[in-house]
Amino acid sequence: MVKLTKRIGGLVLRLAAFGAALAALIVMITSRERASFFAVSLEAKYTDMAAFKYFVIANAVVSVYSFLVLFLPKESLLWKFVVVLDLVMTMLLTSSLSAALAVAQVGKKGNANAGWLPICGQVPKFCDQITGALIAGFVALVLYVLLLLYSLHSVVDPFLLQKS
């Protein structure tokens, strides 16, 4: 019964992490807004910034990985490798979220020293969508940290309890 509960707990965590990464991916991909000022037209989309593209690619990789691991049998010998891949996915989410947050902050506040003006006043819907994607990405990251701890406990704990 305990093993079944642990398996279901891990499955729920993986499913939630998959959903959060997929939500971050979809919201970021659909973020776009066009604004016109007098004769000047401005279109904001995620492909304008390399950090947002990296965020999309990272969340796509994590989503595919999360989906595939859902179907891995519990008796598989690959679970030790899954712990390593969980760590890689956690670091991938961390780096992509950090880069996207930095760019989003510049978009929102600007950077007076570099002469970059904030754009969120002109394209608020775009900025709101980016914020939503970043929130979903942060949720995915937190779930992956929990999943990593859970995976480490599941794989390492049996070795610690064995008698020599």
Swiss-Prot record:
Residues 1-7, 73-80, 151-164 are cytoplasmic. Belongs to the Casparian strip membrane proteins (CASP) family. Keywords: Cell membrane, Membrane, Transmembrane, Transmembrane helix. This is CASP-like protein 1C1. The keyword Mitochondrion does not apply. It comes from Arabidopsis lyrata subsp. lyrata (Lyre-leaved rock-cress). Pfam families: CASP_dom. One of its GO terms (cellular component) is plasma membrane.
